[in-house]
Amino acid sequence: MLRFPFAVSTSVFAIILLPSFALSAQELNDLIQKELERNFATAIVLTDSDVFTVGFHDFDPNEWLNLDNEELGSADSVNLRKKIGVSTLPFEFALYEDPDSQIKHSLQGRLSALGIEQDVSIADVGVSDSHREYVLGAFLEYTNSRQLSENWTFDASIGAHLMYYRSDYTYRSDALADYKSVIDGYLVNTDAWALVAEPNVQAKYLQMKPWGKWYYWSSAHYFYGQGWGEANRGQVGNPEGWYWVNGVKMFYDFEKWGRAVQSVYTSFNRVDVGGDTSESLGTHHYYEASVGWLMTPPFKTQWVDNVGIGLSLNYGSALKGGSLVLFFNQD
């Protein structure tokens, strides 16, 4: 089974069920704590839409392109993508702009929900258990943006995540009957909270063209937090990790109707990950590419910059594969 957060309990179960492997109470607590830390850390990465894209229809690009590249997609990874649901609602508020120093101050953030529901086969008993997990999050950050030159900008931000994790496990088999007392309420059928700080910096090189614009960007993030709650007797640990995104985006404007502008949007990113995120994603780095059509609204609004539809590919992670996606406020 694929190693992934929210499917994490399977790995713990496998260790517990080994007949030759005896865990002390402290070792079991440490194992559960690490799994909870990975849940929160990986949710931070997967709910950042600049880092990971989830669509409404998933597929294996190998079947479309007549290829056999394991890093591009597989039946297992596409099946896993189909079980994951991610919803985000980003927002941004301008605070103050100093025209003399070309410094902008703003608040931005997002509300998010990430969940997965899947069958869990613990032993060869013919009946699978069911496990449903989700993480709800609210993120808010302050950003100081400096215009270094005509093309270069530099942003420094500090933010915080408030996150809630919930596990609902249904025992359909007797595979875990002898171990229910040490996992129920500790690893499964429980909940936990985390408050996570995230400083980050971003450099951006922008070129405006008669046909639109393109830019290169590099954004480095580090996060560290404190967990608490019912899970694992309150020993939820300290989610910690980092990710670094380097990418290029291009917007080609091909049609304009009044205020409405239609554009072709393309992007290519490399994402490096570390800390509690790398094992869950099955890699230390992966790539994402997107292409699509965007349209700005024909009326003036501060809430919607553009909407569109397109295609996204993930290469090299546990969630490799392709998706049809809806774009919202791409910039």
Tell me what each language-model feature is.
Residues D30-R38, T42, Y96-Y243, F268, ...:
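Outer-membrane pore/translocation modules
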Residues K82-P90, E133-F139, A194-N200, Y243-G247, ...:
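Transmembrane beta-barrel architecture of outer-membrane proteins
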Residues E37, A41, V78-S101, R132, ...:
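Subset of outer-membrane beta-barrel
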Residues F91-E97, Y142-R146, V201-K209, Y252-K256, ...:
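Residue-level signature of outer-membrane beta-barrel architecture
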Residues W228-D331:
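Outer membrane beta-barrel transmembrane domains
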